[in-house]
Amino acid sequence: MTTEITRPTAVFPDLEGKIVLVTGAGRGIGRAIAEEFAKQKSNLMLVDLDPRVEQTAAEIASAHGTKVDFRLASVTDSARVKEVVEETVAPYDNTLHVLVNNAGITRDGIAMRMSDDDWNAVISTNLTGTHNLCKASIRYLRKAKGAVVNISSISGVVGNVGQTNYCAAKGGVIAYTKALAAEYQGVRFTAICPGFINTDMTARLPSDIAKYVVARTKVKRVGEPWEIAQAVVRSAAEFGNTYAPCAIVLVAGGMELGG
């Protein structure tokens, strides 16, 4: 399912020492994002509901020699989110430079057969969770003239059969990102839209479905988590670019163009 590709080196000196909070950071794309920031010597707070985030934080800190803390939290719990954000910024004079909203889930099913629980869970985690973090963080980000990077999905752009809840949530993230940029000057907002990425989640898909999705890309391969991570870090590194307050970035192998 993978094709050998050359991984470029991404170096952004302006991110050294910056305070970065990443949700859904225990594994997959979230872990790759955290590792990429650690390479830039940023100070990290990793947030996840999965207890494995503790081991992830320890491994990244050991590998890259930077400060990596973690918290167990559900992004759907607004009170807990507020606590985590306050604990993140307290040691740094109430400053937050970068927020990455990566936490997300899928619960697939045909629209008219989808349970209320499956619909609500996906909207709550993927869209409301993003709002909860932004709401709790915005005043600290404005102080730092920082950056918000929201992880959306190509599914929020082109739609996908069996994922009406996920598509609605991720499409909502794109619109939410644009609206926040209109409301708040001094913070740069980006929505990154990954395509079919090589993670443990996609590895569980039946091979015929995986082949179908790959065939829809222009590059005829899956993406790697580091490709999303480098797009995130690149977007965050431009937080001082006041002439680009908002960007929607598709990192999907050309899926939006048709196979």
Residue ranges with predicted function:
Residues R139, A181-Q185:
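Alpha-helical segment proximal to the catalytic Tyr-Lys
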Residues I110-A111, S115-N120, T202, V213:
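Substrate-binding pocket helix/loop in short-chain dehydrogenase/reductase
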Residues C134, A169, T177:
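Active-site helix of classical SDR
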Residues Y140-R142, R221-V251, E256:
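C-terminal substrate-recognition "lid" of short-chain dehydrogenase/reductases
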Residues Q185-R188, C193, Y243-C246:
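Short, small/polar-rich loop/turn modules that mediate ligand/substrate recognition or access, typified
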Residues T2-V11, V158, G240, P245-G259:
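Short C-terminal tail/terminal secondary-structure segment
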Residues S153:
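Residue(s) in the substrate-gating loop at a strand-loop-helix junction
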